[in-house]
Amino acid sequence: MAEWHKIIEDISKNNNFEDAAIVDYKTTKNVLAAIPNRTFAKINPGEVIPLITNHNILKPLIGQKFCIVYTNSLMDENTYAMELLTGYAPVSPIVIARTHTALIFLMGKPTTSRRDVYRTCRDHATRVRATGN
């Protein structure tokens, strides 16, 4: 879907965000679009499967780096988002939002609030969900 690259372009233009990626979680579990040469571009299927199957996951590996789960409502149909923090310095907020076919990963800069990252990621996911994807 060409819209994935448009979402990544919009996010990369915003100076509040450090990294973003869109990952298929239904079939191949591969990265569909990402900011090149960043952490989320390295996400592999072995890191996606625990996110969607294990509700009690505490320290998932994302892009070969550990993160700490803050809230997990990823598989909830009303919330469809997970908030995390990087497990390394500098600590940055991360949000993963679920559409019907993909996961949207968004990492804010250390100075960006969790609320801004959450709102932006959920807004993109809500728009994509409205189209049926």
From Swiss-Prot:
Biological process annotations from GO: actin-dependent intracellular transport of virus towards nucleus; symbiont entry into host cell
Which gene codes for it?
OPG171
Top-rank lineage group of the source organism = Viruses
Family note: Belongs to the profilin family.
Q: Please name the GO terms that the record assigns under molecular function.
A: actin binding
What organism is this sequence from?
Variola virus (isolate Human/India/Ind3/1967) (VARV)
* Pfam families assigned: Profilin
- SUPFAM superfamilies noted in UniProt: Profilin (actin-binding protein)
Q: Where in the cell is it found?
A: Host cytoplasm
Q: What is the lineage of its organism?
A: Viruses, Varidnaviria, Bamfordvirae, Nucleocytoviricota, Pokkesviricetes
Gene Ontology CC terms, in alphabetical order? host cell; host cell cytoplasm
Q: Which UniProt keywords apply?
A: Actin-binding, Actin-dependent inwards viral transport, Cytoplasmic inwards viral transport, Host cytoplasm, Host-virus interaction, Virus entry into host cell
The name of this protein is: Profilin
- Record text on subunit structure and interactions: Interacts with host TPM1. Interacts with protein A25.
